[in-house]
Curated annotation (Swiss-Prot):
Its main location: cytoplasm. Residues 575-677 form the tRNA-binding domain. Gene3D superfamilies: HUPs, Isoleucyl-tRNA Synthetase, Domain 1, Methionyl-tRNA synthetase, Zn-domain, Nucleic acid-binding proteins. GO terms for cellular component: cytosol. SUPFAM superfamilies: Anticodon-binding domain of a subclass of class I aminoacyl-tRNA synthetases, Methionyl-tRNA synthetase (MetRS), Zn-domain, Nucleic acid-binding proteins, Nucleotidylyl transferase. It is found in: Cytoplasm. It comes from Salmonella typhi. This is Methionine--tRNA ligase. Its cofactor is Zn(2+). Transmembrane segments: none annotated. It catalyses: tRNA(Met) + L-methionine + ATP = L-methionyl-tRNA(Met) + AMP + diphosphate.
Length: 677
């Protein structure tokens, strides 16, 4: 290790907790992981963290659709996401959630500091409101035409075509995504972050030279058009953190989402019992390095709002943003109908993780260019590079070493100068990994692989093996081939973790960047086993077909209670608190003359009797069986006069009706009159 060890904190953008991880997500997580693994190989202290972005109206509404709580949904999604990332060997030190105690505390702290420093403004705004659903519409639940570039079907907060941000009220011909209705305007008090106050600081940060040229140029466009105050609040109903001392107002998801980076790191420090690192990494004058790997669609939030929030609350700013482009498949946007919208979990059923890691890495650079996953080219490149050039180099030599020399390598290198050529390449390849010029690194490595294979071709160990008296030559040639293979795999270790583990088992030696100067001499390797299998287009065809089938299954009509009886519009806690539910003992139950649907129930509320008519006769043909049973009733429902008498409440039951009605009963131990909360 010739460099000074650095402290580095690396993050990926937080996946939203309402959907599965797909190959578009994986580009970023693979890119970051390759960079992190290289940094660790060079001896740096790296903390690699991520979390699920778990707040917002989309999560609230999807949970309602599924008939579960948002907490349950994001918990299940977190497990799925972590399983997918583990399957691709993404080496996170911690994976957390923005719906956490750490994130709440830090969000409130940053907001409070911003407010105390005069950067939070209050004002009443006119906001889009869905008259059919009775709710204010968050940015992402309004679509219309972008007011800047006039692109159609854009969300209410930013345009995915030109990258502009704006207020949903600026959209041309807006429509509610929830109901399709044309929204109306209503007034509401909102909280704003005074972004323009940080314009000078942000422009200086932009001119520092650290940012990618494309990012800096885009930021300059935003400065020229003028920074606007940023609305950081949303009205109830909303799934997120309530703003301190502002009932019914919640932090906008984009306020607490990047703070999730801090929350995840704080959670990691707490798990380790580390009471100092959080401040060391996040204090204003920290000498640790902080890097965010993000997609080009969220540059605005990370390059303007996030550093301004940190500056205004006396935390450190990012060292840099590493921005990448989108993923296309076979030259086009990922498509569910064509089977190219591929989930991470589906990929792993047909290919290993290393194959995609390699292909993405071979195409990545430090620029913000889109990456095309051409599936035919993918098969050809994996077979040509990993199998034919790298793994084949080992297999061509290992057999002779195992069979003829009991696995022991030669005591000297056959060609020390050639070996030095390979180890000297560490500087160029290392710089390519460091600067995220991944494609260049792969090209350099594969050029060396060609040289190594040419050496074996020229030395022809299969010919030497048949010649008497040349055992020493055979051992030297094959040992040289294996040592060159070892150097190549050391360079590839950040990209191919699974293959690297197999190679280390075969070599009986760890692939260590700083150890390549010393070749393996008189060293015993283990029996060679197949390291990597060829792939073919049949696997691709099966993958695409499986993706199509998943789309069909997801699009199949939903059946069951939720489909027949969709969840009603959201109510507030105050609305629910008006309903007084009580445990009631059924003292008597009888038929009602003149009605084939009703039963007359006499209910004891623990000192008060109620007469209730209930339409449950078809499900309970023997009313006497209900006597002595406890149920739950709405005790404060206004009495209703019927021709059979006055009904003084309502008993609670589940089911669609007819014979499928099921009275609700409390657990044993509940007493008549107790309130149900």
């Amino acid at each position: 290790m010739t460099q000074v060890a650095k402290k580095i904190l690396v993050t990926c953008a937080l996946p939203y907790a309402n959907g599965s991880i797909h190959l578009g997500h994986m580009l970023e997580h693979i890119q970051a992981d390759v960079w992190v693994r290289y940094q660790r190989m060079r001896g740096h202290e790296v903390n690699f963290i991520c979390a699920d972005d778990a707040h917002g109206t989309p999560i609230m509404l999807k949970a309602q659709q599924l008939g579960i709580t948002p907490e349950q949904m994001i918990g299940e999604m977190s497990q799925e996401h972590q399983t997918d990332f583990a399957g691709f060997n993404i080496s996170y030190d911690n994976y957390h959630s923005t719906h956490s105690d750490e994130n709440r505390e830090l969000s409130e702290l940053i907001y409070t500091r911003l407010k105390e420093n005069g950067f939070i403004k209050n004002r009443t705004i006119s906001q889009l409101y869905d008259p059919e659903k009775g709710m204010f519409l968050p940015d992402r639940f309004v679509k219309g035409t972008c007011p800047k570039c006039k692109s159609a079907d854009q969300y209410g907060d930013n345009c995915e075509v030109c990258g502009a941000t704006y207020s949903p009220t600026e959209l041309i011909e807006p429509k509610s995504v929830v109901s399709g209705a044309t929204p109306v305007m209503r007034d509401s008090e909102h909280f704003f972050f005074d972004l323009p106050s940080f314009s000078e600081m942000l422009q200086a940060w932009t001119r520092s030279g650290a940012l990618q040229e494309q990012v800096a140029n885009k930021m300059q466009e935003w400065f020229e058009s003028g920074l606007q105050q940023w609305d950081i609040s949303r009205d109830a109903p909303y799934f997120g953190f309530e703003i301190p001392n502002a009932p019914g107002k919640y932090f906008y998801v984009w306020l607490d989402a990047p703070i999730g980076y801090m929350g995840s790191f704080k959670n990691l420090c707490d798990k380790r019992g580390d009471t100092t690192s959080f401040d060391e990494y996040w204090k204003k004058d920290s000498d640790a390095e902080l890097y965010h790997f993000i997609g080009k669609d969220i540059v605005y939030f990370h390059s303007l709002f996030w550093p301004a929030m940190l500056e205004g609350s006396h935390f450190r700013k990012p060292t840099n943003l590493f921005v990448h482009g989108y993923v296309t498949v076979n030259g086009a946007k990922m498509s569910k109908s064509r089977g190219t919208f591929i989930k991470a979990s589906t990929w792993l059923k047909h290919f290993d993780a290393d194959s995609l890691r390699y292909y993405y890495t071979a195409k990545l650079s430090s620029r913000i260019d889109d990456i095309d996953l051409n599936l035919e080219d993918f098969v050809q490149r994996v077979n040509a590079d990993i199998v034919n050039k790298v793994v084949n180099l080992a297999s061509r030599n290992a057999g002779f070493i195992n069979k003829r020399f009991d696995g022991v390598l030669a005591a000297e290198l056959a060609d020390p100068q050639l070996y030095k050529t390979f180890t000297d390449a560490a500087a160029v390849i290392g710089e390519a990994w460091e600067s995220r010029e991944f494609g260049k690194a792969i090209r350099e490595i594969m050029a060396l692989a060609d040289v190594a294979n040419r050496y074996v071709d020229e030395q022809a160990p299969w010919v030497v093996a048949k010649q008497e008296g040349r055992d020493a030559d055979l051992q030297a040639i094959c040992s040289m081939g294996i040592n060159l293979f070892r150097v190549l795999m050391t360079y590839l270790k950040p990209v191919l973790p699974t293959l690297s583990e197999r190679v280390e088992a075969f070599l009986n030696s760890e692939l260590n960047w700083d150890a390549i100067e010393q070749p393996l001499l008189s060293h015993k390797v283990n029996t060679f086993k197949a390291l990597y299998n060829r792939i073919d287009m049949k696997q691709v065809e099966a993958l695409v077909e499986a993706s199509k089938e998943e789309v069909k299954a997801a699009a199949a009509p939903v059946t069951g209670p939720l489909a027949d009886f969709p969840i009603q519009e959201t109510i507030t806690f105050d609305d629910f608190a008006k309903i007084d539910l009580r445990v009631a003992l059924i003292e008597n139950a009888e038929f009602v003359d003149g009605s084939d649907k009703l039963l007359r129930l006499t209910l004891d509320l623990g000192g008060e009797k109620r007469n209730v008519f209930s339409g449950i006769r078809s499900a309970y043909p023997d009313p006497q069986a209900l006597i002595g049973r406890q149920t739950v009733m709405v005790a404060n429902l206004a009495p209703r006069k019927m021709r059979f008498g006055v009904s003084e409440g309502m008993v609670m039951a589940a089911g669609p009706g007819g014979k499928d009605i099921f009275l609700l009963s409390p657990d044993d131990g509940a007493k008549p009159g107790q309130q149900v909360k």
